[in-house]
């Protein structure tokens, strides 16, 4: 019983997609090739994608969800953070990627 409860707790703290996991308590992104502890904005961006896999998310939605409305963040800020995450996903040999959907936004997909 204790093991079952412990496993339930671990599952609620981790989002998985493909071979990649995001721990919502430690901000750790992991896959078979290793792991990274993400910075706050990287974590929030990755969390948005992990909660909405295969959904096209416009950069305006990323901005609204993660940055303060009074901040000076723009679309190029989102692009920068997505580029950081893409590099980290590649480095840990994740089988998922953040794809650009030209004119629409970004989506988290399993690599083909």
Each predicted region: which residue ranges?
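Intrinsically disordered, low-complexity protein-interaction/activation regions
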Residues: 37, 108-112
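N-terminal hydrophobic or amphipathic segments with adjacent small-residue motifs
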Residues: 13, 21, 97-99
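Basic, amphipathic DNA-recognition helix from helix-turn-helix-like DNA-binding domains
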Residues: 1-16
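Short, ordered coil/turn segments that flank beta-strands lining enzyme active or ligand-binding pockets
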Residues: 25
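Positively charged, aromatic-enriched patches within helix-turn-helix-type DNA-binding elements
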Residues: 28-97, 102-104
């Amino acid at each position: 019983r204790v093991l079952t409860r412990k496993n339930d707790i671990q599952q609620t703290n981790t989002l998985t997609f493909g071979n990649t996991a995001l721990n919502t308590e430690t901000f750790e992104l992991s896959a078979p090739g290793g792991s990274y502890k993400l910075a706050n904005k990287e974590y929030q961006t990755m969390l948005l994608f992990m909660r909405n896999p295969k959904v096209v998310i416009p950069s305006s939605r990323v901005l609204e969800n993660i940055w303060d409305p009074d901040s000076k963040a723009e679309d190029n800020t989102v692009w920068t953070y997505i580029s950081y995450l893409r590099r980290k996903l590649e480095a840990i040999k994740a089988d998922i990627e953040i794809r650009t959907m030209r004119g629409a936004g970004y989506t988290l997909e399993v690599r083909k």
